[in-house]
Regions:
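Conserved Helicase C-terminal RecA-like lobe
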Residues: 2-164, 170
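Conserved RecA-like helicase motor core of SF1/SF2 enzymes
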Residues: 134, 142-145, 169-191
Length: 191
């Protein structure tokens, strides 16, 4: 039908799907809302995947994908309070089981650093931690340099109640010394 598809952007959509299906369904739901409001041009679809941008469109070919998923769309995002359902994603379920095992009495008070390329994935992991009453802090591009050091210091403190340090791969960088964590999870790959 003459439409062009950017393969790399479609691959990114599939990477989000492998992180958790609600990340794709959220975009699908927002896409449908935009179409109803007439804000989306039918002739050309621009696909943008920037961290946390609520104006992102779903990748070409992903429109309507939420009807195949085991939930109503829109369960991703920072402001959402819907249950995370780690069992819907292999990676999320393994992370959940690892963290649950870490919190068992007698396991030495392990702490974990979790790195993701997508702030939306960090949103879901943060909600999972909140649902399980696991203390966590989150460092992404919105955190000032002054606050970053306070977060790092608190996480590194052995008496801290923080279990997880959620880190955006694009916000990390020079000067982060996360010696308080004895486990590291790179949640999704990057090119």
């Amino acid at each position: 039908d003459g439409k062009q598809v950017n393969c790399l952007e479609s691959i990114q959509m599939l990477m989000k799907l492998s992180n958790h299906p609600s990340l794709v369904a959220e975009h699908d739901d927002k896409s449908a809302q935009r179409q109803q409001k007439g804000k989306r041009k039918a002739a050309t679809k621009q696909v943008k995947y920037t961290d946390g941008d609520e104006n992102n469109f779903v990748a070409p070919g992903a429109d309507g994908v939420s009807k195949f998923l085991p939930f109503s769309s829109g369960s991703g995002g920072r402001g959402n309070t819907a249950p995370v359902h780690p069992e819907w994603s292999g990676k999320m379920f393994v992370l959940y089981r690892l963290m649950k095992e870490m919190r068992k009495p007698g396991n030495g008070g392990d702490k974990i650093v979790i790195i993701s390329n997508y702030t939306q994935t960090l949103d879901l992991i943060g909600r999972m931690c909140r649902e399980s009453s696991w203390g966590f802090c989150r460092l992404d591009g919105s955190v000032t340099m002054k606050k970053r050091q306070k977060m790092v210091d608190e996480f590194n403190d052995p008496s801290s109640s923080l279990v997880a340090f959620l880190l955006s791969s694009k916000a990390g960088g020079c000067g982060l010394n996360l010696i308080g964590g004895n486990r590291l999870v790179l949640f999704d790959p990057d090119w």
